[in-house]
Amino acid sequence: MGKPTGFMEIARQTSTELPPEERIQNFNEFHIPLPQDEQQAQGARCMDCGVPFCQAGMMIGGMASGCPLNNLIPEWNDLVYQGKWDLAVHRLRATNRFPEFTSRVCPALCEAACTCGYTTGSPVTVKENEHAIVEYGYESGLLTACPPPTRTGKTVAVVGAGPAGLAVADYLNKRGHKVTVYEREDRVGGLLMYGIPNMKLEKQVIDRRVNIMKAEGINFVTCADVGGRTPAHDVLDAHDAVVLACGAKQARDINAPGRDAQGIYFAVDYLTSVTRSLLDSGFSDGKAVSAKDKKVLVIGGGDTGNDCVGTAIRQGCASVTQLEMMPCPPTERTAANAWPEWPKVLKTDYGQQEAIAVFGSDPRIYQTTVKEFYKDEAGQVCGALIAKLESKVVDEATGRRAMVPTGEEFAIECNLVLIAAGFTGCQPYVAEAFGVDLTKRGTVADTKYATNVPHVFTCGDMRRGQSLVVWALREGRDAAAEVDKSLMGYTNL
């Protein structure tokens, strides 16, 4: 703790965001980092707590409190303040192999659990300190390829090149195993590449990291649909172990009349089409699902729904409405949601901010769902019947509550519908191809990341269900240790 009074003397200062009217003109990242000296001052705000909840990563009330990767946050906060950037890079990378991802897309569980935030109302800028450290590492040449000095002679196949797959591949390669990553898409990155829009995570950031992994000896095979066009038994026969890290990509659908209308898409398919067209041709190929001049209805109030709102606005939509089943959260913590739990409070994300700037109002309508889709004579969606919901006890014995219709309904016009209602588990064909068991939740059943099939492991959302990138990285790290132990009889990961 280089400056014991830092949290009292220095105000929280974050990066500058480009104004909504300016940033919606393109799909570029829109945060302007602080100058290095100002970022160093932010490091002084860390209190080096005796019990640093920021790095705890423990479950409280069913949600994570603090960093799931157990990042050494007080250490590198102080190193930032001291200007010891080289050492800060080293200590950050001790627990997080991909800070360039988490410093952009993580919701900052660390800051929600920050003691400084609890005592002063302004948490330490942990996420932006992390971003400054990793970008310094690249700019200074510290983050370059470092292949393992020896090889074990063991080979591992990783199926899926999302955050969990990249993490498990990186750790196993560092251990000396020969790793091949199979990805069914045309680019490496999984959710990071096609599920998160470019303005949140520019794809050159992914490519920069993947190029280092390639130089370190990891082999990437794209357009390889293992369990589909690429037989699972070929992959299993060619390797000593296989890790399934295919994510939770089975989208939750809306079971309503008119669902077969044209112009209704799952959010991930919409976002994928936009990013692929951007990367392939700068949109000149015309292959992106377009929201231009359309009245857009987004079903789902989470991060993916927000990404759809921001993407549709950048495409020039005529209007955008976002439905959220749950009630509007409070603006401040309630007594039932005490620190250091994750704060269940109202958040207006970048997409909603942009909708407010462009259309003059928040796009969200709470406690609503679609009862019916309307379509015109050509079969194109042209509107939706919206049902209002309320929370009621549906099981007197347990007190379980659910959102149920109130009977109040209203109609809206829309000619593009994006379903962002979450995911129900993994797409089962990969699991079936390998013969691994699934749980009732649609995830792969496991015991310490090992499936019921010998030498076949699993990690990430495919194992734990839909979650955050930071959890996928934690899963990959922990799974790598179990795979290594299976191959070598012990592990030093």
Task: Give the location of each predicted region.
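Beta1-alpha1 glycine-rich phosphate/pyrophosphate-binding loop at the start
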Residues: 5-32, 41-44, 68-80, 90-92, ...
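C-terminal catalytic lobe of FAD-dependent flavoproteins
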Residues: 12-37, 42-45, 366-368, 374-375, ...
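Ferredoxin-type iron-sulfur electron-transfer modules in oxidoreductases and energy-metabolism complexes
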Residues: 25-38, 64-65, 69-104, 108, ...
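Glycine-rich dinucleotide-binding loop and its adjacent helix/turn
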Residues: 132-150, 208-229, 251-315, 438-452
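Feature captures the FAD/FMN-dependent oxidoreductase FAD-binding
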Residues: 150, 155-159, 207-256, 371-385, ...
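Glycine-rich Rossmann-fold phosphate-binding loop(s) that bind the pyrophosphate
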Residues: 159-163, 300-302, 461
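FAD-site-proximal beta/loop scaffold in flavoenzymes
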Residues: 260-293, 393-466
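A conserved FAD-binding loop/helix module that cradles the flavin
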Residues: 305-308, 315, 462-490
